[in-house]
């Protein structure tokens, strides 16, 4: 994906023509249905209300699907292509454009999601300080996204410092949305020294994409190394080194590999 395509995706959310058309069609269908009734006004009102109660969730689902589809397309850069640097570049491009142009309609919602993605892109590129400055600047207006990003930064710092006690304390206070991610839960087990539990959980977990597979294998390798099983650790770390492309886990795996 190029910057131009990313901007095009952002611009597409300025128009709500498709959503408006959907609502108009439902309205017309409702009107025709009511007119076809045998002049029973009570039934007509009931069906009218029922149709709109159906149409509104359908319209919302349509909008949510459209946004999610675009977000997933952008996330593929890091999740499938394993190119964290390009991911940061593309997300920043959208953030910069959105910040300097008036936001219309669904662009506001899409931009809020991109703000959280930008903070995450900085973190996975090893730019924790910049991510923290971005959050502290108050740019991320949506509180759940801000809290999620803050937890990621604090946990990343505690992990880098090797401070298990601090890591667990932060993890326990992290948003539910963070702790629900299996990879995060297993990382917490590893930091508590529960290596076998972490490995077992990760062995049973089916990754959703290539990046998750890299993260899964890296954590398994690290857990084996920490418990002293160097032969097992070697297998998983070698996979990460050979397939991690530009992901920082590749370079972290290379450092751990030196301990074998």
PLM features per residue range, with description:
Residues 57-143:
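N-terminal topogenic membrane-targeting module
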Residues 230-260:
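Terminal, low-structured helical/coil segments at or just beyond the last alpha-helical repeat
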Residues 132-162:
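A membrane-cytosol interface segment of integral membrane proteins
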């Amino acid at each position: 994906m190029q910057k131009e395509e990313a901007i095009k995706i952002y611009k597409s959310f300025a128009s709500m023509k498709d959503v408006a058309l959907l609502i108009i069609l439902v309205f017309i269908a409702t009107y025709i249905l009511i007119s076809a009734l045998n002049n029973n006004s009570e039934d007509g009102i009931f069906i009218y209300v029922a149709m709109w109660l159906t149409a509104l969730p359908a319209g919302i689902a349509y909008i949510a699907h459209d946004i999610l589809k675009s977000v997933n397309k952008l996330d593929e850069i890091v999740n499938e292509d394993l190119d964290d640097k390009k991911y940061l570049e593309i997300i920043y491009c959208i953030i910069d454009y959105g910040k300097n142009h008036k936001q219309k309609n669904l662009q506001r919602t899409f931009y809020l999601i991109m703000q959280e993605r930008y903070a995450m892109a900085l973190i996975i590129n090893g730019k924790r300080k910049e991510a923290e400055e971005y959050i502290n600047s108050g740019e991320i207006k949506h509180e759940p996204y801000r809290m999620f990003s803050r937890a990621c930064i604090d946990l990343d710092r505690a992990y880098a410092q090797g401070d298990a006690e601090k890591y667990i304390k932060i993890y326990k206070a992290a948003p539910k949305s963070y702790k629900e991610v299996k990879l995060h839960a297993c990382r917490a087990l590893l930091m508590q020294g529960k290596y076998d539990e972490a490995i077992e959980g990760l062995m049973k977990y089916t990754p959703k994409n290539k990046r998750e597979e890299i993260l899964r294998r890296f954590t398994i390798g690290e857990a084996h190394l920490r418990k002293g099983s160097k032969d097992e650790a070697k297998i998983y770390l070698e996979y990460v080194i050979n397939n991690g492309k530009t992901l920082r886990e590749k370079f972290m795996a290379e450092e751990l590999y030196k301990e074998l």
